[in-house]
């Protein structure tokens, strides 16, 4: 099946980017990744509208489901092996999450994320992608339940970077994180743009990020016209 898509984008205000994509509602031909699932999370493809957890990127490994600049998981596979980072409010599933894969994942901890004031406080044990570097990306198979326009709301820490989304391998330009929080572990939650899916169905969402942030999740919320 031939896959075609087209998009347009425009700036709205100072910080938000409108992303408009027309798609045939199918995954790209030949894509070998699979929606994340394990013994705890068995739901499969994450759903839009809803929350896309950054740590639940697809299964498939380096070059298929993600690209990382090195093979070490500097959170679950390195930092969290130290006893002081295995917090009593957590468990081995959380501190060791996807430890054998290259994407750097950790979780929110009492002494790192809750010993100060956040702009928006994350949940305890919230998984996140950290140790980010330029050129890294993760793929997410998403199930778009209803065509239309959605706000993108990010929970993130640190730099006011630009991040890029692609859908079905088609670049959709950049979104601007609106506020530099001052630390990887000072968190903010804010709308960074909107995205329009012209059709429902499975889509491949690729999140491209740059050096200097922690990313927990993206909420995709229907705008009023969709509801």
Model features per residue range: what roles?
Residues 25-227:
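Extracytoplasmic
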Residues 12-22:
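Bacterial N-terminal signal peptides
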Residues 2-12:
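Bacterial N-terminal signal peptides that target proteins for export
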């Amino acid at each position: 099946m031939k896959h075609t898509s087209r998009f347009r984008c425009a700036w709205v205000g100072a910080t938000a980017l409108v992303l408009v994509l027309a798609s045939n509602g199918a995954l790209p031909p030949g894509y070998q990744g699979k929606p994340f699932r394990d013994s705890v999370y068995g739901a499969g493809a994450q759903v839009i509208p809803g929350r896309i957890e950054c740590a639940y990127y697809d299964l498939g490994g380096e070059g298929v489901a993600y690209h990382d600049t090195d093979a070490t998981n500097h959170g679950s596979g390195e930092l969290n092996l130290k006893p002081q980072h295995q917090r009593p409010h957590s468990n081995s599933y959380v501190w060791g999450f996807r430890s054998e894969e290259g994407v750097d994942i950790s979780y929110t901890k009492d002494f790192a994320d809750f010993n100060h004031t956040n702009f928006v406080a994350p949940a305890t044990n919230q998984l996140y992608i950290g140790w980010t570097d330029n050129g890294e990306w993760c793929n997410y198979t998403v199930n778009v339940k209803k065509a239309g326009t959605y706000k993108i709301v990010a929970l993130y820490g640190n730099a006011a970077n630009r991040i890029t989304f692609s859908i079905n391998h088609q670049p959709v330009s950049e979104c601007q994180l609106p506020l530099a929080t001052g630390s990887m572990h000072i968190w903010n939650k804010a709308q960074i743009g909107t995205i329009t899916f012209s059709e429902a169905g499975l889509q491949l969402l690729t999140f491209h990020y740059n050096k200097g942030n922690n990313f927990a999740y993206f909420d995709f919320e229907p705008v009023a016209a969709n509801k």
